């Protein structure tokens, strides 16, 4: 969408934008953005040509994604062919969720999932997640180590207390948020 061709010709554009809550000690670090080229994202071909998984952050089967974060997370972008099935292993103490972008899934042989749905898995219970695509499906599977801190959100800010929210708005109004630096990985 930043290319001259896209600007001139238009077309469909789809993205998933994620905001990751930071530990309290890191909330006031300077903002940043990671521009990651698709060529730097490992692609895992799933068994029996059933689909593929792109490891954007974290690790899957020995492949490490290029995105970095302040606390341990996994961000996997997956696709499964119709009637394909795969079991994903996730860290036992992570919070895990699946966002279905397209298609239809059956999770753990019991939960039917429709497009534009989010599934939140029970922590410490579901470390083996079986996914069956009843249609060609695209999804994002995310896991993260719980911060175990209070959360207070309002508008674009997520802090730990209401007072910190007020301070964040005040800092923003006063221009204290600085410039956004782009961390780009280029060959």
Residue ranges, per PLM feature:
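Jelly-roll (double-stranded beta-helix
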Residues: 1-187
